[in-house]
């Protein structure tokens, strides 16, 4: 009776020996020399094919489960089935005081100054240069002596600046807007800085600001919500609702823009000195003459919070807990999951 081939081992030599033992016990091959070049080569091919098939089956099965998957694309995909979107890279953030003194002798000075979002600074960490910028409008009021202290819109003199290069990607919606995926080819995107706008047409100046579906509290057919998640190749894909239960969907021919920061993550942590890149123009109200001044910058908090993409170990740990919380904050585990999601760049799991 023929000996059964043992198929539990993936070792190439063991597979070849098992094949040889099996064939030697077949009457058709009783007097064959299996060490001869011809038969040995045939056994090598059979063993190699069996070895590769076994490895492929083993790898494929491992990639089918969250706990055993090794490829990032597989882990991210499994997390997605639990409603979990792994964290992207995050920008390092610092706070600065920003001011300048035009001089008490200067006449015809405006009462208020405003600087739009995107005012840039440079800094360095370990001899590498990084760009930081504001993410909101800041303004300053003349104190009566031509001194201007800039503040955020909520009145704070500590102005947050974020590391990264501002980028904008533009798309045009086609006919099948519900199933369209818009790919942003940037592995360094900070998802939290994304701003999505949908214009009525390519030439229209009117737009609707869309919100991230993750933070939407009430979703219906008119809710302007977007979905932004990591694609299998490490880029990011933008999509919209279905026009009913998941919110509004852009109409065909509309223009879609996404603005975001492309960041260096943890490399930019620890920046202390910030140099303004551009002057701030002060226009005299009466004459219309523009004066340009470099503001004085003082650091109140060095840059922190920059991080790499969420690790595979962190995704495996956090995604089941996130699924269990369902965005609630009731049990201690709910709080732990949501705190890790919000402040994961600042604390350890």
Question: Where are the predicted features?
Answer:
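Signature of Asx- and small-polar-rich beta-strand/turn repeats characteristic
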Residues: 1-349
């Amino acid at each position: 009776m023929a000996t059964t081939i043992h198929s539990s081992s993936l070792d190439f030599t063991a597979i070849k020996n098992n094949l040889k033992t099996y064939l030697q016990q077949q009457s058709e091959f009783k007097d064959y020399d299996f060490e001869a070049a011809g038969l040995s080569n045939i056994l090598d091919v059979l063993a190699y094919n069996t070895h590769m098939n076994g490895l492929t089956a083993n790898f494929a099965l491992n990639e089918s489960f969250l706990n055993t998957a090794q490829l990032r694309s597989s882990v991210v995909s499994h997390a997605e089935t639990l409603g979990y979107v792994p964290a992207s890279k995050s920008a390092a953030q610092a706070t600065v005081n920003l001011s300048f003194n035009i001089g008490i002798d200067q006449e015809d000075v405006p009462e208020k100054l405003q600087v739009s979002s995107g005012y840039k600074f440079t800094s360095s960490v370990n001899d590498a240069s990084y760009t930081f910028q504001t993410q909101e409008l800041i303004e300053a009021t003349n104190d009566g002596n031509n001194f201007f202290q800039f503040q955020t819109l909520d009145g704070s003199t500590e102005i947050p600046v974020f590391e990264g290069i501002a980028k904008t990607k533009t798309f045009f919606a086609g006919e099948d807007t519900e199933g369209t995926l818009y790919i942003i080819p940037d592995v360094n995107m900070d998802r939290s800085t994304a701003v999505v706008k949908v214009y009525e047409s390519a030439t229209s100046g009117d737009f609707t600001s869309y919100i991230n579906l993750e933070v939407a509290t009430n979703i219906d057919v008119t809710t302007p919500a977007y979905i932004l998640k990591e694609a299998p190749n490490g880029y990011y894909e933008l999509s919209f609702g279905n026009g009913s239960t998941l919110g509004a969907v852009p109409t065909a021919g509309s223009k879609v823009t996404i603005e975001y920061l492309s960041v260096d993550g943890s490399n930019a942590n620890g920046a202390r000195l910030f140099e303004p890149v551009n002057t701030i123009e002060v226009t005299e109200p009466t004459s219309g003459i523009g004066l340009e001044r470099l503001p004085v910058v003082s650091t109140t908090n060095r840059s922190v919070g920059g991080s790499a993409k969420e690790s595979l170990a962190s995704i495996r740990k956090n995604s089941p807990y996130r699924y269990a919380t369902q965005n609630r904050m009731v049990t201690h585990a709910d709080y732990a999951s949501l705190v890790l999601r919000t402040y994961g760049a600042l604390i350890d799991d």
